[in-house]
C-alpha cells in the first residue's frame, strides 16, 4: 500500500517541480524597474494638493503619501519643445540645438535622430517602450517617436493650440491623432479637444496591461493643462464651472488610472513613476509660493515644477526632498536603475540622482549650480536672475532660504556674490555655445494631415 501511494505521489511531485519556476517568477521582483514618466503641460507649481492647492487631487495626494515630494525640482527649459528635448536626452536643449523655440506643424526642424533618448537606452536593455500623448519634437517621420526608440506611439504630434481653430494669424492643417506613424483621426472642435486626456490615458493603460509581463517604459506627455482649455461638460459641472479645477482633476484621475493599473497587475512594487511638468504655469494656473510663471523673467515659478516620485517599498513613503534635481537627471538615473551605461561619446548634462530618490543617507544633489537657461543661476540658497526691459538690463539676487517668493533683491548688498554667479553663468553659456550639436533638419517637410476628408474625428474614432 505504501509503495502504491509513493508511486501515485510521483506525478504530483513532478507537477510541482514543473510549476515551481512559474510560481517563483510570479513573486519575483527584478532589480530593474519598469518606468513611467507622466509629463504635464503648463501646470503651475501650486496646482496640485501635495504642493498646497485647494484643487481636489486625491490620487496625487495618495501618490505623495506613498512616495516622495521633490520640492526643488527643475525643468531645463521653459517651453514645450526645449523642455521635452532635455527630458528625453538628459541634455540642455541649447546643447542639442533645440533651445531656441518650439517646433510647428510641418517644421523642417526636430530632435536629431542621432541623439540618444531614454527610450533607446531602455529598449537596448530589453524594455518595451511606448509614448502616449503630446510629442512636440518634430512631426516629420525621422523625428517622430518610432524613430526615437519607442515601439508604440499614440497621441498628438504637437501642441493642441496648433489646430485649425487656433491662432488666426497662422494657417494650420487639421490637428491629427496619430497611431504609430499614421493619422487615424483628427481634432476639429471643442468636443474632440475635451477627450484628449482620456484618449491618452486609455492608450497608456492598454500598453501597461499588454506589457505587464516584461520590463517597460511608458512615457505619458499630456497636452493638458495647455490652452485651449477644453474639458467634458460632466467634468466642468463637477468642478462647478472652474475650468482649471476640471483640468487638474482630469490629470489627477488619469494618474490614478495608471497607478491603479500597476496595482491591479501587481507590478506596482517594481515600477518607478515620476510625475512632473514641462515648465511653469500659464494662464489661470497657480505658482503657489513662487514668483513668476511660464512667461517672463527666470523667477522660480518659471522653471521649478511640482514633482512626485513613487516606487512602493523602494522610495520612502511620505518623504520630502529639497535637494536640487532636474529633468536632465532622469535619463542617467533611469539608465542606472536599468543597469545601462549612459552614452560616453557625447556630453550628457544630467546626473544619476537615484540615491536621493531611494532615501539613502547623506545623499546630496550632484549640482553645484542650477541654470535657468541663459538668464539665471542658483548655487545653494543663492539665486541670480537677469533680464531686459527694452534697452535696460536688470540683475537681481535672492536668498531662497529666507525669500522663496523672490521679493527682496540683495544684489546691492552682496556685489561679490553677484559677480561670482554672473561669471559662473557666463562660463556655462560659453561652454554650451562652443559645443552645440545640431538639431535634425529635413528638406521640404510635409504636413502629417493636409486634409481631414475621410478621416474620423477623435470622438468618432473612440466610439467605433
Residue ranges and their predicted role:
Residues 32-36, 66-71, 125-130, 151, ...:
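Loop/turn elements at helix/coil->beta-strand transitions in domains of secreted/extracellular proteins
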Residues 53-57, 68, 74-79, 105-116, ...:
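A short beta-strand-to-alpha-helix junction
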Residues 28-33, 40, 44-45, 69, ...:
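Long, internal low-complexity/basic segments
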Residues 98-100, 105-108, 112-124, 137-216, ...:
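Formylglycine-dependent
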Residues 147, 151-152, 157-161, 281-300, ...:
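C-terminal cap/loop subdomain of S1 sulfatases and analogous C-terminal strand-loop tails that border
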Residues 37, 45-130, 140, 145-152, ...:
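Active-site segment of extracytoplasmic enzymes that catalyze sulfate/phosphate-ester chemistry
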Residues 141-149, 228-231, 239-247, 260-314, ...:
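Histidine-centered active-site microenvironments of extracellular/periplasmic hydrolases
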Residues 49-55, 69-91, 99, 131-143, ...:
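Short, solvent-exposed turn/loop segments enriched in Gly/Ser/Thr/Pro and often Arg
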Amino acid at each position: 500500500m505504501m509503495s502504491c501511494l509513493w508511486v501515485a505521489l510521483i506525478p504530483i511531485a513532478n507537477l510541482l517541480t514543473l510549476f515551481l519556476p512559474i510560481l517563483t517568477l510570479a513573486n519575483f521582483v527584478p532589480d530593474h524597474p519598469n518606468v513611467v514618466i507622466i509629463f504635464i503641460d503648463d501646470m503651475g507649481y501650486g496646482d496640485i494638493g501635495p504642493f498646497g492647492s485647494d484643487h481636489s487631487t486625491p490620487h496625487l495626494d495618495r501618490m505623495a503619501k506613498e512616495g516622495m515630494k521633490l520640492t526643488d525640482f527643475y525643468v531645463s527649459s521653459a517651453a514645450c519643445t526645449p523642455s521635452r528635448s532635455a527630458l528625453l536626452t538628459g541634455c540642455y536643449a541649447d546643447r542639442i540645438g533645440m533651445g531656441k523655440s518650439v517646433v510647428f506643424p510641418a517644421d523642417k526642424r526636430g530632435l536629431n535622430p542621432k541623439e540618444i533618448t531614454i527610450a533607446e537606452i531602455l529598449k537596448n536593455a530589453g524594455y518595451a517602450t511606448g509614448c502616449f500623448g503630446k510629442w512636440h519634437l518634430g512631426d516629420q517621420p525621422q523625428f517622430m517617436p518610432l524613430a526615437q526608440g519607442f515601439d508604440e506611439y499614440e497621441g498628438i504630434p504637437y501642441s493642441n493650440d496648433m489646430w485649425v481653430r487656433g491662432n488666426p494669424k497662422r494657417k494650420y492643417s487639421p490637428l491629427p491623432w496619430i497611431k504609430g506613424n499614421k493619422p487615424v483621426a483628427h481634432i476639429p472642435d471643442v468636443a474632440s479637444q475635451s477627450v484628449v486626456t482620456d484618449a491618452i490615458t486609455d492608450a497608456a493603460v492598454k500598453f501597461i496591461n499588454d506589457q505587464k509581463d516584461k520590463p517597460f517604459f511608458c512615457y505619458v506627455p499630456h497636452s493638458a493643462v495647455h490652452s485651449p482649455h477644453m474639458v467634458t461638460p460632466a467634468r466642468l459641472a463637477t468642478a462647478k464651472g472652474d475650468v482649471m479645477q476640471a483640468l487638474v482633476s482630469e490629470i489627477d484621475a488619469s494618474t490614478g488610472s495608471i497607478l491603479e493599473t500597476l496595482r491591479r497587475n501587481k507590478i506596482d512594487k517594481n515600477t518607478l513613476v515620476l510625475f512632473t511638468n514641462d515648465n511653469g504655469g500659464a494662464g489661470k494656473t497657480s505658482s503657489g509660493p513662487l514668483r513668476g510663471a511660464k512667461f517672463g523673467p527666470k523667477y522660480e515659478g518659471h522653471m521649478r515644477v511640482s514633482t512626485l516620485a513613487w516606487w512602493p517599498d523602494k522610495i520612502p513613503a511620505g518623504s520630502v526632498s529639497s535637494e536640487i534635481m532636474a529633468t536632465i537627471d532622469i535619463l542617467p538615473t533611469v539608465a542606472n536603475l536599468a543597469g545601462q551605461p549612459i552614452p560616453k561619446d557625447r556630453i550628457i548634462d544630467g546626473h544619476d540622482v537615484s540615491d536621493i530618490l531611494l532615501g539613502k543617507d547623506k545623499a546630496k544633489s550632484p549640482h553645484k549650480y542650477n541654470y535657468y537657461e541663459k538668464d539665471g543661476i542658483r548655487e545653494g540658497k543663492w539665486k541670480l536672475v537677469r533680464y531686459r526691459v527694452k534697452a535696460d538690463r536688470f540683475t537681481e539676487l535672492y536668498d531662497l532660504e529666507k525669500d522663496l517668493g523672490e521679493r527682496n533683491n540683495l544684489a546691492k548688498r552682496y556685489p561679490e556674490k553677484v559677480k561670482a554667479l554672473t561669471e559662473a553663468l557666463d562660463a556655462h553659456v560659453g561652454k554650451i555655445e562652443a559645443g552645440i550639436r545640431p538639431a535634425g533638419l529635413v528638406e521640404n517637410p510635409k504636413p502629417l494631415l493636409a486634409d481631414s476628408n475621410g478621416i474620423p474625428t477623435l470622438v468618432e474614432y473612440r466610439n467605433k
